[in-house]
Amino acid sequence: MTTMTITPAEDFVKAAYQHGIKDQKKLQELKNRYSLQFKRSPFSNIELLKAYRELISRGEMTEDRDFFKVLRKRGVRSHSGIANITVITKAFPCPGKCIFCPTEPRMPKSYLSNEPAIMRAILNDFDAYRQTLNRLESLYRTGHHTDKIDVIVSGGTWSFYPKKYQTAFTRGIFNALNYPAPKARSLEEAQKINETAANRCIGLSFET
């Protein structure tokens, strides 16, 4: 007979649940006490969410919406039930000559490489599919619902990108939202699949 070993994070989650923790302040107090008692650094919310999900999957805990909200990190991002994902287009010549507009090499016009969204885009080579999938995974890890997604496309002047690039970029977004379904070959097909996907696009805006 195999004995399941409980991890420190799972042990903490069980203790927090048994203590009836219902707000971030009480959770942090328990984190601090646990940290002092066991001489370890405090658990991150991501670690606790992973442990919570594992305990539920093994049938050792039942789902509790209020407790889940306490463990979830940065709840304001999806407080309305809609999660936002920003995807950045690659650098492309802009016809504008605005004096105040930054023109950093290899960056979309008006954006700087030290901005969080741009840094994520750089890590994903400005690929729409990879950026979207990366953000979905991040949202899931931090406890956010991803069934309703509002996508914002930022970057250079969208209307001056080649039509082929516009279509491929947008298709990449939908293909990522449709994962793990196979990638669609056309934008129309990707949009159709997304109508019944787990991560549905309920809004798509181009802020360029």
Give the label of every model feature segment.
Residues N175-R200:
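Short mixed-charge
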Residues M1-I118, I122-Q131, R135-A181:
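Flexible, acidic/Gly-rich N-terminal and inter-domain linker regions that tether
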Residues R77, E195-E207:
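Residue-level signal for functionally critical sites in structured catalytic/ligand-binding pockets
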Residues D150-G155, I202-T208:
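Extended hydrophobic secondary-structure segments that form protein cores and membrane-embedded regions
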